[in-house]
Amino acid sequence: MTENKTVLYSYWRSSCSWRVRVALAYKKIKYEYKAIHLLKDGGQQKSDEYSKLNPMKAIPTLEIDGHIIGQSLAILEYLEETHPENPLMPKGSYERAIARQMMQIIGSDIQPLQNLKVLGLIAQYSGDDSKKSEWARTVITNGFNGLEKLLEKHSGKFCVGDSVSFADLCLPAQVYNANRFNVDMTPYPNITRVNQHLLTIPEFIEALPQNQPDAEPQC
């Protein structure tokens, strides 16, 4: 670990890394990008060297302020607490709770159930590679059904009112995944509307997969 140097271990298409990239952009924190390819060499996150940084062998990992932090949602909380400038949460306690509720729907109920590791297990135990997309669509649809209702009640320009929150940092990557797995977005007008707004904001554009140094041509 390099003292006083911020380093993000990331993969261009990783949903969890994407959230952190947006946060770092909003907080105006300069960092070094170190690519960890999730497929090459059997998964570079499984290497002995990287495992010393992150015992879960997952990304992202952030080196910052002399510390090493894994898990994207924990990283977001740390950045908000230690770098209060350009806040990423609403002021009101209730609004903050709703933002965290939305964040957890994506970060706990949807994305982990359709990530690369889980889809690999689906194919392995079913013996049918085509089941991966079917499973992902089911998981995303179930989660979006609940998220859409919350956005109908609480959203403005952003997921919660008219200011950015952790929920917004999680949304674009999940919509990206929904599109990858051909989820019908017609039933989700509020998710679509908020996501379209987010993708006009410079910090969100900077964090897009295709704008990362390790982006691959098929993006």
Curated annotation (Swiss-Prot):
Signal peptide: none annotated. The keyword Ribonucleoprotein does not apply. Coiled coil: none annotated. GO terms for cellular component: mitochondrion. This is Maleylacetoacetate isomerase. Glutathione binds at residues 14-19, 45, 71-72, 111, 115-117. It catalyses: 4-maleylacetoacetate = 4-fumarylacetoacetate. It holds the Pfam family GST_N_3. GO terms for molecular function: glutathione transferase activity; maleylacetoacetate isomerase activity. GO terms for biological process: glutathione metabolic process; L-phenylalanine catabolic process; tyrosine catabolic process. Residues 4-87 form the GST N-terminal domain. It is an enzyme of class 5 (isomerase). Belongs to the GST superfamily. Zeta family. Its cofactor is glutathione. InterPro entries: Glutathione-S-Trfase_C-like, Glutathione-S-Trfase_C_sf, Glutathione_S-Trfase, Glutathione_S-Trfase_N, GST_C, GST_Zeta, GST_Zeta_C, GST_Zeta_N. Residues 92-217 form the GST C-terminal domain. Keywords: Isomerase, Phenylalanine catabolism, Transferase, Tyrosine catabolism. Transmembrane segments: none annotated. Its EC number is 5.2.1.2. The lineage of its organism: Eukaryota, Amoebozoa, Evosea, Eumycetozoa, Dictyostelia. Pathway: Amino-acid degradation; L-phenylalanine degradation; acetoacetate and fumarate from L-phenylalanine: step 5/6. PROSITE patterns: GST_CTER, GST_NTER.
